Amino acid sequence: ALPICRRHVIGGVIYMEEYLKTLLEQIRCKKAHASIYHEIRGHIEEQVADNIAEDMSKDDALKAALNDMGDPVQTGVEMDQLHRPQMAWRIIVAIGILTLFSILIQYLVTRYIPDNNAYFFRHHIFNAIISFSAMIVVYRIDYSLIGKYSKWIATIFLLFFAFQIFIVEMRLNGTLYMRILSKVLIMSPLFFLYVPLFGAILYQYRGKGWRVVPKIFIWMALPLFLTLELPNLGVTISLFFMLASLLTIAVWKGWFTFHKKKFLTAFWGISISFPIASVAILMQTGKLALYQIARIHALFDPTVENHALQTLRSIVTNSAFIGASNKKSLLQEGQNSDYILSTLSAYYGILVALVAVLLILLLIRKIFQISSSQKNQLGMMMGYGCGIVFFVSAFWNVLVTLGLVFPTYTFLPFFSYGGVTMVVTYILLGIVLSIYRYKNVLSDTYMYKKNWDVA
């Protein structure tokens, strides 16, 4: 029930709560009632205070304030047009166009894959249909439910993958997979779904001090520990920067009571220096295998002989701005997935690869715009999490394409071949669309009313 204000106008004819009740009856979206109630009541009380300052009595001040608000039925009808779920048709259409472009890209790439080109192309279309459908389903879900039960969802998420990794342990060529029904799915990209969950967990710790820092670090460390078992260093590094970026945003926005500059300086100082120092010590003490040392040398020394790195660098340096390269035959495995940008550069020119990257950057920009415009801090943080996943994934893919980091598992959102990566991409987009859908409905007032700010 809404709080009741017993102050009345002359003669006790009209009460403030009656005005608000009548107004709210015109608004069909029940989830918007709490935020609208507090917003309108705040306006009325501010106007009452101003009227009293002008030597009005309390009753006259309230009567004048309610008169200024206008007829509650008319005002409620007008607010009903604003405070309702928004249909993001333009964004959905834009995503649909981008999906069609990704299908075109896969057609242009898979036509050069011998024997199985038709299979890969048909499978990509099937994945696109399934993924787009998943996006629409998530879009229709109220994202605040994810925020409300974020810790439970994260716990189930981590336990499920721990079971898959340590109990089931289905490995193919050293990489962990899992089976759902008759499908064998790669596990790595699914961990990126944890990022918006982590943003929702941070939301629940707002207003706390140093005592929640160990809890936050545990929620960060658990998925990172699991990714080390995949094994996939690229996923671990990417996931760390995604989670660390969200934590940095939350701290910088003053969500916690501890000193933000001191915390961030210590956090990033340790995060950067500790891995470097650890690798240096392991190399000096001979704890690393020869192939691991060779990979580290290849990463920082372009003259070191490494077939994969040399191939990627050769493709980039020999690609034409428009048209095919004489090095296009070098790249075979992963040409339509991990190394999609290298393939586009080799077969069609750097311009086509740049267009693909530009489209993704425009999408990322839109995601951050939607997130930063949210009045609801939960929606803002979960939206940032989705945007960060896209940015880090695309950035890492570009680094691999340019031969600047050692080739490891990577994908370019939308364009890389793979059912799991595509579903993950569209689920994250569904969360962003849900945030947009409820932008004028949910507020932090609603969250506080539901007692979500728990330890």
Enumerate the language-model features and the residues they cover:
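Alpha-helical transmembrane segments of multi-pass inner-membrane proteins
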Residues: 162, 186-250, 431
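Hydrophobic alpha-helical segments of polytopic membrane proteins
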Residues: 217-222, 234-282
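Loop-to-helix entry and N-terminal half of a specific, functionally important transmembrane alpha helix
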Residues: 370-409, 415
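Short, small-residue-biased leader/transition segments that mark boundaries at the very start
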Residues: 1-2
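Hydrophobic alpha-helical transmembrane segments
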Residues: 126-131, 346-367
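Cytosolic juxtamembrane regions of integral membrane proteins
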Residues: 58-115
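A juxtamembrane structural motif centered on a specific transmembrane helix
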Residues: 404-405, 410-455
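Hydrophobic, glycine- and aromatic-enriched re-entrant/interface helices and adjoining loop segments
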Residues: 260-355
